[in-house]
């Protein structure tokens, strides 16, 4: 492991690097939302570079929340939220993907380092405003010669609340200037029908061909393989049952394992309680050709 001062992002931020010598190098930026800024496998960078890219954690929700609002049947600390007509308390998150709120809050927060060694590291951040409930999110990285395992936990530090967790990696479409475009292979059980507002309608339909900006159900766990012909194969697995696949950008594709679908805080809420935290993990396993 090494740390290094960097002039990008937050002033004084330190990168954390995990190394499997001769095989892989992972760079994490704790003060920039605990984002992975680089994953190099056998001298090939596989993630799109830039402040918005790499791979970032999504919590306490994934994807879009309709109009930035969700309801909870637990009173928020400090009050001040409106009671909805259909019951519960309505909370308003900041709109950052008009007219919705997208991808959670922790990607915009600095994280603290808990433990670091040569090939693993753990970080955490506390849930704060605008999220109305006290809690903590923890993320662990474990690097080996042929795999990276990410684990994220969301825990309550007070009242119970609905939550989701997942990851949003931006994989390069081509590895190097002469590489062939990546191929995406997966076999979902269904596709969440997407409305004109980019939210699932609630209907499950037969999976269709790309290009995609869509959520898919994989009840036996996420299993998606990316293949860069003659260069690299990378398989993304997770016990999570939903994955968003986005391949509409020329430079990169996204495969996002997550614990629930977009707008899931409203449609399929998973309650985090003081005795029942949410935990999700994903493993990216690779082999060179």
What are these regions (language model features)?
Residues 71-77, 114-120, 142-147, 175-179, ...:
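A short, structured loop/turn motif at beta-sheet edges
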Residues 1, 8-10, 81, 95-144:
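Extended, loop-rich substrate-binding clefts of extracytoplasmic carbohydrate-active enzymes
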Residues 1-89, 220-239, 276-289:
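Beta-strand-rich N-terminal accessory domains
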Residues 125-169, 174:
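Acidic, contiguous internal or C-terminal segments within carbohydrate-active enzymes
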Residues 158-162, 169-239:
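Active-site/ligand-binding surface loops and adjacent short beta/alpha elements
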Residues 256-289:
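C-terminal structured interaction module
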Residues 226-262:
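Glycine-rich active-site loops that engage anionic ligands at enzyme catalytic sites
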Residues 68-70, 138-140, 268-273:
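Beta-strand-rich interaction surfaces with strong enrichment in secreted/lumenal proteins
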């Amino acid at each position: 492991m090494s740390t290094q001062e960097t002039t990008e992002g937050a002033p004084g931020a330190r990168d954390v690097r995990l190394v499997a010598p001769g095989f892989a190098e992972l760079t994490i930026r704790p003060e920039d939302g605990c984002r992975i800024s680089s994953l190099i496998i056998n001298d090939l960078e596989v993630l799109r570079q830039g402040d918005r890219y790499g791979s970032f954690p999504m919590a306490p929700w994934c994807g879009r929340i309709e109009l930035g609002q969700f309801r909870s049947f637990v009173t928020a600390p400090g009050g001040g939220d409106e009671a909805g007509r259909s019951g519960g308390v309505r909370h308003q998150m900041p709109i950052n993907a008009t007219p919705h709120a997208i991808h959670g809050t922790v990607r915009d927060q600095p994280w603290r380092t808990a433990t670091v060694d040569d090939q693993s590291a753990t970080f955490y951040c506390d849930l704060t405003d605008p999220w109305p409930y006290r809690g903590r999110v923890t993320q662990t990285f474990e690097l080996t010669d042929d795999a990276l395992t990410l684990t994220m936990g969301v825990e309550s530090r007070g009242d119970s609340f609905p939550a989701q967790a997942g990851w949003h990696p931006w994989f390069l479409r081509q590895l190097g200037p002469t590489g062939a475009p990546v191929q995406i292979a997966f076999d979902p059980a269904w596709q969440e029908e997407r409305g004109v507002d980019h939210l699932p309608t609630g209907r499950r339909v037969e999976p269709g061909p790309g290009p995609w900006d869509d959520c898919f159900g994989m009840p036996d766990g996420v299993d998606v393989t990316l293949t860069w012909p003659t260069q690299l194969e990378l398989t993304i697995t997770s016990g999570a049952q939903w994955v968003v696949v986005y391949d509409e950008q020329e430079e990169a594709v996204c495969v996002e394992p997550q614990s629930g679908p977009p707008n899931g805080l409203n449609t399929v809420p998973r309650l985090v309680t003081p005795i029942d935290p949410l935990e999700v993990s994903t493993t990216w396993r690779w082999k060179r050709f």
